[in-house]
Amino acid sequence: MIIFLKKYKSKIALIVFICVLVCTVSCLLDFKTLGKQKMPGLEKKSVFMAAENTVAKNTDKAVNEPRLHAVSAALYDADDETFIYGRNMRDSMANASTTKLLTCIVALEKADINDTVTISQNAASQPAVKLGLVAGNSYNMKDLLYGMMLESFNDCAYAIAEHVGGSTEGFAKLMNEKANEIGCLGTYFITPNGLDAENDISFHHSTAGDLCVIMSYCAWKSPKSTQFLEITQTMQYTFETEEGQMVFNNHNRLLTETDYCISGKTGFTTKAGYCYVAAVEKDGRRMCLSLLGCGWPNNKNYKWDDAKSLVEYAVSDAAEDSYCDAACVTTQQ
């Protein structure tokens, strides 16, 4: 055996070398082929990575991306109907008195602004903030609309809802139908004034994205947009009642603190925090912004700071170059 191995040593070595070479080449060819195949799991991961890359590109474009306090926020181009910026903009959240945007436009579309409204005990007993409507007394619809939109009076909202819808439940149905009609499928309203409530279906809520669309409809697309803007742009409104002269002051600070704001509505409940929705215009470019959960007591001015940041972003070159689609999600956490 030893003699045999010595005799054929060189041939055995050659055979071993050839075998190793063949195996190596075969493995390399298999690996190359495997790399071209769409392997389960890897394909999904690549799609996810592509989405991450898209977000990263948007981040690169949005050099001046706003830094916000709000839990949820959105910035919307009303003409292109696309979202420019979003933070948790599809999350269902309590939205407080920003609800009154839809209350106002539904009332304007369904009733006459000169209607006489008789106040029920239910409307008169609404909690603050309230005008102090007296049950059994009558008021002009126009005066109630100004009270609701300028001072955010809860009793005015209830009186309007009962007059237009026959009941607050009937009016809520009209509100939700309008929300669905304009594409706001993440909105479900129970109360006309935005106070927190729940029923067997859900809780009173909207989304930052939906509120931008609602504001866009109110300000520019409703057949009653002109009346809506006239009401929400009025800085002070005075009228006479059986109880004496009433003076309402507009609480939308951005009307006077920026050159771009043309309408807006504030809101607050313990659950919702401070909220704000606004419409802005710049050189014919129409946009809406919304902020939900923008601080709680002791942080009342956060909404103004955030709104100004979004307004500045809206009219900056960064916003003009950073459009995203309706599924827009923020890259800022």
Explain the meaning of each model-derived region.
Residues 9, 149-152, 179, 183, ...:
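Generic secondary-structure transition motif, activating predominantly at the C-termini of alpha-helices
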